[in-house]
Amino acid sequence: MSKYIFVTGGVASSLGKGISAASIGRLLKNRGLNVTIQKFDPYINIDPGTMSPYQHGEVFVTEDGAETDLDLGHYERFIDENLSRINNITTGKIYWSVLSKERKGEYLGKTVQVIPHITDEIKSRIYQASKDNDADVVIAEIGGTVGDIESLPFLEAIRQMRSDIGRDSVMYIHVTLVPYLEKSGELKTKPTQHSVKELRSLGIQPDMVICRTHYELSQEIKEKLALFCDIDVNAVIENLDVENIYEVPMALNEQRVDGLIADRLNLNSGSLELERWKQLVDQIKNLSQEITIGLVGKYVSLQDAYISVTEALDHAGFNYDSKVKVKWINSEELEKNGSVETAFQGVDGILVPGGFGDRGIGGKIMAAQYARKNNIPFLGICLGMHCSVIDFAHEVAGLNGAYSSEFHPETPYPVIDLLPEQKEVKDLGGTMRLGAYPCKLIEGTRAYEAYQQDIVQERHRHRYEFNNDYKEQLTNNGLVVSGVSPDDRLVEIVELEDHPWFVATQFHPEFKSRPGAPHPLFNSFVQQALKNSLSSK
């Protein structure tokens, strides 16, 4: 029978509940347990797919094509498991399902209510995650903070589970903030006390409190929190800020968090094996080189919009003993001022990630052009690929006015065009080409050299694609098609033949990168950027 750990948050949002949940998952997995992690988001959207990155940050895409919260990226990277749509549930999905059942008459004339129908639906998704993943332990993070009206049905559902399956199968962990007041020079426990009081008023007694803090908690503070939160002193966990998120599992392990969980849930687990993780963290702390990557996007004021990209760069950097410094370049400002020399001064590589809409598109095209002309290692992702193709078609292949029909429907040369199967699609939500699809690699190319495989599976999120009507003309002028769908219908990767390293992909390689196992394309890109850095010194 599966065990369930519920992670709630209090005092403030953005405390790192997702990192805490992912770190606990890593520790339990290293004890030999099969772990899966869920995120419950209390917003009414079905998923974050149509939300602005400024509102939500990155949309993380799973293998099965779910558009999910960015925390799922953290979960996958920490526990090294592919998750699916059952691992991210929103209020919108829950109500949609319940209302659909009501219309079908599945409630047999009953009045449909939050309790039991909404709460039962929530619980069914938790049990389904356990079943689908054959999990020994399910960790479920409840989004938002305790006290938010939107979270109440989720909190009630997880409260009920203690009665449904027994106290020994359910554990509650509350993540809070212990703020430091500069004026008085002391840490304040009152916000955490009130947050736990609010949680207890809803019928949930936390078994452990993880305290985010800038300063170490004294024994006196821990004892005070234990007294007012009604938990053991050793269950008051200090979660200090760290330089790198991959240090968190070790920090929790030093306080026996995994041991406390194993004891509380009577887990039949093995001894903890954390040596490889410690080696990774030691490696991260002692990187001897540094490179700079210019990341050109229009959401750069909210860096969480590109969190998987920056993590993938870091993973590759670890592999080459290099810290990867990101120089954030606003594509809209670049388009307006045109100062490419200033923008890319000191960069060792240029990366243009995905995005939507025509705002700032000119700046991204300028970035691809600058990398092409100056032999700077370049990685284009999704829209980044489109921009590199547009630049090449216009500047090299002589197709003046070439563009994407997404932005210029009247372009005489739509080198990027809508996928045929998308032409009758009207709804925006969940209707793109989503999830993992196979890609056939062409031997003798940069892509094949990076992967060393004939067929790879990569995750997609797009409606527009390379237009094969211009394939022959572009390849005759030096564009290399290095990856295609198995039926040769879709172009997945393009390169430049007379360039040290210029690769652009239709898919999103960043979603499959892991610490200790960097994605092959990011690995090769960072390697070339490092060579570029060393040769310029």
UniProtKB/Swiss-Prot annotation:
One Gene Ontology MF term: identical protein binding
Residues the entry annotates as binding ATP: 14-19, 71
Residues noted as binding L-glutamine in the record, renumbered to the chain: 54, 355, 383-386, 406, 463
Nucleotide-binding is among the record's keywords: yes
Reaction catalysed by this enzyme: UTP + L-glutamine + ATP + H2O = CTP + L-glutamate + ADP + phosphate + 2 H(+); L-glutamine + H2O = L-glutamate + NH4(+); UTP + NH4(+) + ATP = CTP + ADP + phosphate + 2 H(+)
Binding residues for Mg(2+): 71, 141
CDD domains with a match to the protein in the record: CTPS_N, GATase1_CTP_Synthase
Listed EC numbers: 6.3.4.2
Keywords: ATP-binding, Glutamine amidotransferase, Ligase, Magnesium, Metal-binding, Nucleotide-binding, Pyrimidine biosynthesis
GO biological process, one term: 'de novo' CTP biosynthetic process
GO cellular component assignments: cytosol
Binding site for UTP: 13, 188-193, 224
Region (Amidoligase domain): 1-267
InterPro entries: Class_I_gatase-like, CTP_synthase, CTP_synthase_N, GATASE, GATase1_CTP_Synthase, P-loop_NTPase
Domain of life assignment: Bacteria
UniProt function note: Catalyzes the ATP-dependent amination of UTP to CTP with either L-glutamine or ammonia as the source of nitrogen. Regulates intracellular CTP levels through interactions with the four ribonucleotide triphosphates.
Note: CTPSs have evolved a hybrid strategy for distinguishing between UTP and CTP. The overlapping regions of the product feedback inhibitory and substrate sites recognize a common feature in both compounds, the triphosphate moiety. To differentiate isosteric substrate and product pyrimidine rings, an additional pocket far from the expected kinase/ligase catalytic site, specifically recognizes the cytosine and ribose portions of the product inhibitor.
Stated name of the protein: CTP synthase
Gene from which this protein is expressed: pyrG
